[in-house]
């Protein structure tokens, strides 16, 4: 999804994820044919939805390792415990792929992290949680080229026919590294144009003004 500022793209992602700031008063949010509009955030997460924010929240006092372990534990049947050895082995392997220092595991979630570190951390969470639907809300905002490549690498490593991505961005730059199957342009809360990857290039060349005559 590509959109100018104020078009409703972040509202869309937060409504899908069940953010507390929004209440659905009309319409439905269908996930695999089931309306999830009344589900709580944690229920939507267990249903397979992951939302990466433009500005990831800090969680002082909770280490990255404990945060991830608790999130994975919450998805298991009652009475079943995570294998700690397997968990750390998997987490360290994923961190190595994302070029993350292993010291991050003991640091509080996003506290004192740079913008690029926060985005790497979110991609680590996404890979570890292995969701069926990933919502990336302007996750490329403010990233340098190295961090952008790491984010793209994480996304591309998860691409499959059984997983969906909704990538929300203003810019073509991210799509130089993540090739979309479909591009939808939003304006004033509605999808006003849809196409393939070539639509993103058209937007890059002409800007959003071309929509007024499209």
Locate the predicted segments by residue.
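Helical segment within the ABC ATPase nucleotide-binding domain
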Residues: 148-161
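Conserved H-loop
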Residues: 162-170
